[in-house]
């Protein structure tokens, strides 16, 4: 509710569990569009921005945690929301560990699985294409 400011009031121990503060926020239009599309009754533009900033803190924290634990190879599994279009976690990971070789994989659901639809191209480095009637877990 209070943006990033109240995070500074967390105890030193609590701050160990999040990305370093102050967080250099990077706008993610995809995230903002997603939150706007939720059409929450009575929501204001500031509410969407706060939700996007909360999401950025999550992504930055995941990026920071990965950066602190990288060995020769590191696999991190997350929903595409956190890494589509090289944004989200990737943005912050590149800040915390510049020069890393990062590859993203996205699962795509389509009617026809023999060829990727053009609208999904460039969202990830690799794709796993599954039929639309495949069981989901969300």
Positions of PLM-derived features:
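A substrate-binding/cap region within the structured catalytic cores of diverse enzymes
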Residues: 1-69
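N-terminal start-of-chain detector that recognizes signal peptides
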Residues: 47-48, 75-78
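Short catalytic/ligand-gating loop segments at beta-alpha or beta-beta junctions
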Residues: 55-57, 78-81
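C-terminal regions of proteins
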Residues: 61-64, 69-75, 82-138
